[in-house]
Amino acid sequence: MTTVHGISDPNYVSRQYRDASNLNVRLRLHQEFSTNPQGWHRWLFEQIQLPRPCRLLELGCGTGSLWAENQDRLPQGAEITLSDLSAGMVTQAQENLRSVRAEFRFAGLDAQSIPFQQGTFDVVIASHMLYHVPDREKALGEIARVLKPDGVFYASTVGLDHLKELKELAARFDEDLLFWGQMPADSFHLGSGVQLSRFFAQASVQRYPDSLVVTDAALLTAYMLSGRIDLSAERQEALAAFVAREMQAHGGQIVITKDSGVFAARGSLHA
């Protein structure tokens, strides 16, 4: 039996991110096989302008990788609140950042109902998470509300062609996986600037140039199994064998498109 879960299904999101295990599998693939020598989190941090002093909120902080990988760049005196809907993720972020010299605060919260007063933050970050939010308009309204009038919202996401070769690989293995990895057109992707225009006066986007050249069939299979699909043990074994054959047929590697970037939205219309 093959099951494909919706990317914003609350039950799926809750199970998927109850701890860091699935996320770590996906991060490892990108860390080992990305062609851009500047890692994603180092690049992303360069796109974020942090005023001094700064009050910052990150929604969906995951394991805290953005801050762990940029600890040498953190501005002094910044008040950084890291939050996630998953208590397991918050705990992992706390552990990962225990030795980092910065003023971190941690919170479990829902982006659709942010428990801070209007105009609290200079910067709000939502990295690769808005497509998981069931009521995105409500979340964007909340983000615009808690930003200061001159504050900036940074929202990273992927484009519709992100990992397109991997999606095609999955569909060749099983036509029931045709929609594995596909992002609905009304989700939040790099073509979704119009969604931000309802809440912010300006929004610009920067893309991160990168691709994957994967030479480890087992890790690629683990990546595919780490999110949105449920396969029986027998079908998992069949997928692993299929990926290995495909990689061998392509000279021992599979080249995969990456399309990621970040919006910077300014001028909250709810300030």
Question: Which residue ranges define each predicted feature?
Answer:
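A short SAM/SAH-binding and catalytic strip from SAM-dependent methyltransferases
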Residues: 122-135
